[in-house]
Amino acid sequence: MQKPQSIPILRALHTACVVVGLLASQMSHAQVAPSQAEVAGYRGLHAAAARGDVAKIERLVATKADLNVRDAYGRTPLHVATFAKQNGAVRALIQAGADKSALENDRYDAVTIAAVADDEETLRTLLSLGASAKLMTSRYDGTALIAAAHLGHDGVVRQLIAAGAPLDHVNNLHWTATIEAIVLGNGGPRHQATLRALVDAGANLQLTDRHGKTPLALARSYGYAEMVQMLEKR
């Protein structure tokens, strides 16, 4: 018979295995940036977006080029410019009328692409030009905020919160941004700052994962003392 003190250890190991499995699943559906071969084969607006060639974008726009043309992976020129961190191209495309909410094949929009890349400058440009922080994106029915919280991109998280991102959206893994900051984070300074931003913004700390665990219970189970202290004060 197992000793009683071994049960919490087994539970922790089970939780860790579940998270590892979910991480592997998420990686299989991660964002796919254009490959070097794809970029080399681009023409028109896709090529100009990848290079950040604003003058070429403006010339093509003047000829009525399709601003939302898709590559083989469903990426528009705006997606490509965002992946390439070509801030000037992002601005030029949006100002010309590009669809700010377009989703590529894995259902990512430009805002979520910038959030995952921790690209605060491009994100700031997108949001200032009217791109939404509220879209449901990815195959996990998540949001840019959930993706950024998962990765501990605290500056991005603060921008998204300021832009009205839904704090308590629950994805199809039954996780909120707050929960992902804990269970998919490492408990380090950036994930702590992410959690702090969410808590200070008023995230609902009573929402649970599909096993009924609150953020506080999850932080305790992972041994994240700083996060536990933060959550206990609420």
Task: Give residue ranges: language-model regions.
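Ankyrin repeat boundary/linker residues
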Residues: 38, 71, 104, 137-138, ...
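Ankyrin-repeat-protein effector appendages
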Residues: 2-4, 30-44, 163, 183, ...
